[in-house]
Amino acid sequence: MEKVKVAVNGYGTIGKRVADAIRLQPDMELIGVGKTSPNYEAIIADKKGIKIYTVKDNIGKFEKSGIRVAGTIEDMVKEADIVVDTTPNGVGATYKPLYQSLGKNALFQGGEKADVADISFSALCNYDEAKGKKYIRVVSCNTTGMLRIICTMNKISKVEKVRATIVRRAADPKEVKRGPINSIVPDPASVPSHHAKDVLTVIKGIDIVTMAVIAPTTLMHLHTMVLTVKDKVNRDDIINTFLNTPRIILVNSSRTTVSSTAEIIEVSRDMGRVRYDIPEVVVFEDSIYTNGNEVFLMYGVHQESIVVPENIDAIRASLGLMGKEESIKVTNDTLGIMKGYLL
């Protein structure tokens, strides 16, 4: 099988995970990563044998730090079949003219505005619609979590209304300049938060309102959600559907004593997962409650890794490499993504 050549522009929290995931795919070759600062992440990438590309003016800085440079970011893009842009929020749009001028397909992340791409993407929701699109935006971690739940619930009964509150982590574990550390901050105080609008870029016309707050934690986001569906639903049907859906796992707090994001992370550590990543949505089974045609639930979203499999599937969708079910299966198998129960 001839492998497609993939470049990752940006090598931070998401970029390094996507790069590692690409290296595990049977149909992809990581040709290199774009990095503008010679920090510890660049040093580690170099030690792992990943080719590093940077902007021309920074080549000397990398070499001074003992980091080998394979060329400029433009050189990398020229060699690639597709670029996964994981640069900081808003930066991806500034690179789009480069990708366009070289005729390269590109993926962008949820921090970019929706109009940067031809389509916003969630593998469980609209993989087929994204096939053959030159520019795809993989929605944010929180939006990915919401969409997995909503699109899965649609299999049981059409979702007509969603009301959700997002308790956001304040910072990633490595981020030392973000907070708060002793406050809960409305994000924003006005309603709705931007997450509702982002869901609408994938599922058109749904009645959705979201609110968000930032909490002093680094581990995961936590969502509380109320869905109104067309027909009366049964709790057992919801549980069984979740158990049989890839990238959603349940945790039974009563049985396992796992009842917090901290304990979910600890389980992932004890399972030996790389970086303790949890790319699955983790639904607290005990929280699932039905009242007529209303469904209530809570679930955790690991912000550092949930979008990684989405990026892998988006590569295949953009280049037309595989159908939806095949791509999701290959991605899940290579990345060790679970379904069913966490424990």
Curated annotation (Swiss-Prot):
Binding site for NAD(+): 13-14, 111, 169, 303
UniProt xrefs under CDD domains: GAPDH_II_C, GAPDH_II_N
EC number: 1.2.1.59
Primary enzyme class: oxidoreductase
Domain of life the protein comes from: Archaea
Catalytic activity: D-glyceraldehyde 3-phosphate + phosphate + NADP(+) = (2R)-3-phospho-glyceroyl phosphate + NADPH + H(+); D-glyceraldehyde 3-phosphate + phosphate + NAD(+) = (2R)-3-phospho-glyceroyl phosphate + NADH + H(+)
Gene3D superfamilies: Dihydrodipicolinate Reductase, domain 2, NAD(P)-binding Rossmann-like Domain
Main location: cytoplasm
GO biological process: glycolytic process; lysine biosynthetic process via diaminopimelate
Positions contributing to D-glyceraldehyde 3-phosphate binding: 140-142, 195-196
Cell location: Cytoplasm
Molecular functions (GO terms): 4-hydroxy-tetrahydrodipicolinate reductase; glyceraldehyde-3-phosphate dehydrogenase (NAD+) (phosphorylating) activity; glyceraldehyde-3-phosphate dehydrogenase (NADP+) (phosphorylating) activity; NAD binding; NADP binding
Family matches, as PROSITE patterns: GAPDH (PS00071)
UniProt keywords, alphabetically: Cytoplasm, Glycolysis, NAD, NADP, Oxidoreductase
Annotated coiled-coil segments of the chain: none
InterPro entries: DapB_N, GlycerAld/Erythrose_P_DH, GlycerAld_3-P_DH_AS, GlycerAld_3-P_DH_cat, GlycerAld_3-P_DH_NAD(P)-bd, Glyceraldehyde-3-P_DH_2_arc, NAD(P)-bd_dom_sf
Involved pathway(s): Carbohydrate degradation; glycolysis; pyruvate from D-glyceraldehyde 3-phosphate: step 1/5
Any Pfam family matching the protein: Gp_dh_C
Record's signal peptide: none
The family this protein is said to belong to: Belongs to the glyceraldehyde-3-phosphate dehydrogenase family.
Subunit structure: Homotetramer.
HAMAP family: G3P_dehdrog_arch (MF_00559)
UniProt name for this protein: Glyceraldehyde-3-phosphate dehydrogenase
Organism from which the protein derives: Sulfurisphaera tokodaii (strain DSM 16993 / JCM 10545 / NBRC 100140 / 7) (Sulfolobus tokodaii)
Gene, per the UniProt record: gap
